A protein has these predicted regions:
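Short, surface-exposed loop/turn segments at secondary-structure junctions
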Residues: 237-241, 264-267, 342-343
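Core alpha/beta nucleotide-donor-binding catalytic domains of modification enzymes
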Residues: 23, 28, 32-255
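A broad structural signal for alpha-helix termini and local helix breaks/kinks
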Residues: 94, 129, 262, 334-338
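Conserved anion/nucleotide-ligand pocket segment
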Residues: 256-266
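AMP-forming adenylation/ATP pyrophosphatase catalytic core
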Residues: 5-15, 19-82, 102-106, 138-140, ...
Length: 386
């Protein structure tokens, strides 16, 4: 009887007939009871994992310097898995942390009906959680065409502009985005492949003005596991799977290859590299900011700096010793002119340095993002391209 009962619980491969077994009366019922118990155990493990994730995220929120009880914080929710997980966990932490949580959704109007469906999905979830929803809209395609920039830049500027608007109006104090450790690794790797310096290795910053990123210590798959445990649906943006996009290829092909063939901890190591680089970049950034205030003259929509001050910041004569500070100073100037520092790679910085050393008066150098550099005798002038 015991042997027959044991074999009755074996799972046989799909497509293969299981053998006929004659079980004693009551064995089927007992087998179902065991199945129910196993299912309950699995469900409990899922709930335990979900509770542990909520505990970890709440603890991470509480450790941040910007945290305080009563904080009004909005979760930026696109409808995708990561942002839905952020919203659910932020909602779960409300009572424990004493925060005022809300949802923030920005409709880019890029995917027609799908964009509107995303908005409706987020609205329904926010309502079910008892959270206020703040919605912004923009025709990002028209904005990109008008400003002569790509869709990604236009979308980011419109979206973050909306976040700043909410903060300036006092609707929220901070907006939390759902960038994960995987996003950090992808960003650092993308910068390395493009060519970058220490600022690029720093990757995604945990806080930038009114925007915070509390999930940078968490893996993307853990967030999906959390959602599955909560039986929570999410929306998928088809553009994230578009293999024509570099970021999508990196996510689907390159990083999995590196994890499988070289180091299963590559994502964690890239994220750790960004932490170390950020510490050093912050020091260099502070020095460059002081240099910029002292040596850069703003006027007429442009920024002017002497060639000597650019090539030898702080009077450092050695090219290699001054290289990091010089690169950050160029980044600082370009940011002042166009607010799009990210488009300037290490190769572009080298081009500016070469132009400063060899360029003739009246000559121009074009940089990406609509920035030109004009040589005026012993100075360089950075200005927006007309």
């Amino acid at each position: 009887m015991g042997c027959l009962f044991f074999f009755a619980l074996i799972d046989f491969p799909a497509g293969r007939d299981s053998p006929s077994l004659i079980l004693p009366e009551g064995s089927y019922r007992q087998a179902h009871l065991w199945d129910d118990a196993a299912n309950e155990a699995r469900a409990l493990r899922k709930l335990d994992f979900a509770s542990e994730m909520e505990r970890r995220v709440a603890a991470q929120l509480g450790r941040n310097a910007w945290f305080r009880p009563g904080l009004k914080i909005g979760a930026a929710v696109s409808g995708g898995a990561d942002s839905i997980a952020l919203l659910r966990m932020l909602s779960a932490a409300r009572a424990e942390l004493g925060i005022v949580a809300s949802a923030v959704h920005f409709n880019h109007k890029l995917r027609g009906r799908a964009s509107d469906t995303d908005e409706a999905f987020v609205a329904a979830l926010a309502e079910s959680l008892g959270l206020t929803l703040h919605i912004g809209h923009a025709d990002v395609a028209a904005k990109a065409k008008q400003e002569k920039i790509n869709l990604e830049d236009a979308g980011r500027r419109a979206r973050y502009g909306f976040f700043e608007q909410l903060a300036s109006q006092g609707v929220v104090e901070l907006v939390a985005t759902a960038h994960t450790m995987d996003d950090q690794a992808e960003t650092v790797l993308a910068h390395v492949l493009r060519g970058t310096g220490i600022a690029g290795l720093a990757g995604i910053h945990p806080q930038a003005e009114h925007v915070v990123r509390p999930l940078l210590r968490f893996r993307r798959e853990d967030l999906r596991r959390y959602l599955r445990a909560k039986k929570q649906l999410w929306r998928e943006d088809a553009t994230n799977r578009d293999s024509a996009r570099t970021r999508a290829r990196m996510r689907k092909k390159l990083l999995p290859l590196l994890e499988k063939e070289f180091n299963p901890m590559v994502v964690e190591h890239l994220a750790a590299l960004s932490d170390r680089a950020r510490e050093q970049a912050l020091f260099v950034e502070q020095l460059a900011g002081q240099m910029s205030q002292k040596c850069v003259v703003l006027g007429g929509g442009g920024a002017r700096i002497g060639v000597t001050e650019l090539l030898h910041p702080l009077g450092i004569e050695d090219d290699e010793a001054s290289g990091v500070l010089r690169a950050r100073l160029i980044q600082e100037i370009v940011t002042r002119v166009r607010q799009r520092r990210g488009q300037i790679s290490a190769a572009h910085i080298e081009a500016v340095v070469h132009f400063a050393k060899t360029g003739e008066t009246g000559k121009r150098l074009q940089l990406p993002g609509g920035v030109d550099v004009l040589r005026q005798r012993a100075a360089l002038v950075f200005f927006p391209r007309q």
